[in-house]
Amino acid sequence: MIKSELVQIVAARNPHLYHRDVENIVNAVLDEITDALAAGNRVELRGFGAFSVKNRPSRSGRNPRTGDSVFVEEKWVPFFKTGKELRERLNPGMNGNDNGEDD
């Protein structure tokens, strides 16, 4: 699903809202999440998951085409951890027992 499809679905479920307003709301939510992450904050949507940023330290890498060693600079990357309710919905019938044993 892409952003425009999300806007269409939300607008269809909320016929009292203008399509333009739904698009503005979706954009505002995404902008706020992006701004929070850029500021180094964590964004938690209870039951859905949490967005955060993680540091990838600099390292020595390899150019796959030439095999030459290259320096890869340190960078910050977005990270998403799923919430319990989302995991349960994606895996119906699972009882939340994470020990790997069968019931």
UniProtKB/Swiss-Prot annotation:
Q: Which GO terms describe its biological process?
A: DNA recombination; regulation of DNA-templated transcription; regulation of translation
Q: Which InterPro entries match?
A: Hist_DNA-bd, Histone-like_DNA-bd_CS, IHF-like_DNA-bd_dom_sf, IHF_beta
Q: Which GO terms describe its cellular component?
A: chromosome; cytosol
SMART domains registered for this protein in UniProt? BHL
PANTHER family xrefs:
DNA-BINDING PROTEIN HU, INTEGRATION HOST FACTOR SUBUNIT BETA
Q: Which family does it belong to?
A: Belongs to the bacterial histone-like protein family.
Role description: This protein is one of the two subunits of integration host factor, a specific DNA-binding protein that functions in genetic recombination as well as in transcriptional and translational control.
Q: What is the protein name stated in its UniProt record?
A: Integration host factor subunit beta
Encoded by which gene?
ihfB
